[in-house]
Each structure stands twice: as C-alpha cells, then as structure tokens.
Amino acid sequence: MEEKRKKIRVLVGGVFDILHVGHIHFLKQAKELGDELVVIVAHDETVRMQKRREPINPAEDRAELLRAIRYVDEVYIGTPGTIDMELVKRIDPDVIAIGPDQFFNCEKLKEELRKHGINAEVIRIPYLYKSDRAKTSKIIQRIVETFCE
C-alpha cells in the first residue's frame, strides 16, 4: 500500500489592493513551492496603518478576488495590526513566502515564528516581473494623472 505524503502548505500575506500582474506572478511562484497556497489578506485597518491610506477595495472584496485565482486554495482576512500568529498557527504552513517588495526581515520573522511554535521555512520570492505596471502605488498614480488632472 502506497503511503500518502503530507501536502506542503505555503502561506503568503499581503494587501492585494488593485490586483495586478505582479500579484499573479508572486502567487504563482509561491504555489510552486508546495501543494496548497493559503493567503492572508491584510485587514483594512492594517492597510491604513501600513500604507497610510484607505484601501481602494475592502478586505472582503480583495479576498473574493483572490479566491478566484487558480493558484490560491484558501483565503483568510487578517486581524488589524501585526501578523496574527494564532491564525498562522492554525493554518500550519510548511513554508511562508515573502514577496520581493515586502519589508520583512526573514531572520527576525523566523525567530518570531519559532517563539510561537511555528516551524515553517521562510523564503523570499525574487522579482520575476518588475515593472511599474506591477506596483499598486504606480497604478494609482497613473489613474490620478490620467483621470484627475
């Protein structure tokens, strides 16, 4: 009888506001690290704190869009503030993939995960697609320049 291998769960987090091709490339690369891709979407309050702006789309809409992407298996909305380690623990990832433009110190994150009993590998995804078309802030800037001036 063939023994079933454990599925490798990959976790990513992000704002994912104004979904663009850079997000798709990131999600695809993250999915390639395992069998299941779980996404934690930043809570609206977290967006306000980190980006110092209102989210363009509410978290529920961003989550729904992500659920429609073929690389994504599960989506959760995070809690306001910092990383919800209890949610991460419940998800039980084998790998946490960090985006190329996310400002995380991978070593500090690993240390914080270990403190909470989470033994996941942390991998930074390199830029595969680097373009102004793949940055939400640049997209917003182009919209303003095109339609508001």
From Swiss-Prot:
ATP binds at residues 15-16, 20-23, 101. Pathway: Cofactor biosynthesis; FAD biosynthesis; FAD from FMN: step 1/1. Its EC number is 2.7.7.2. This is FAD synthase. SUPFAM superfamilies: Nucleotidylyl transferase. Belongs to the archaeal FAD synthase family. Coiled coil: none annotated. The keyword ATP-binding applies. Catalyzes the transfer of the AMP portion of ATP to flavin mononucleotide (FMN) to produce flavin adenine dinucleotide (FAD) coenzyme. PANTHER family: FAD SYNTHASE (PTHR43793:SF1). It catalyses: FMN + ATP + H(+) = FAD + diphosphate. The gene is ribL. Its cofactor is a divalent metal cation. InterPro entries: Archaeal_FAD_synthase, Cyt_trans-like, FAD_synth_RibL, Rossmann-like_a/b/a_fold. Gene3D superfamilies: HUPs. Homodimer. Keywords: ATP-binding, FAD, Flavoprotein, FMN, Nucleotide-binding, Nucleotidyltransferase, Transferase. One of its GO terms (molecular function) is FMN adenylyltransferase activity.
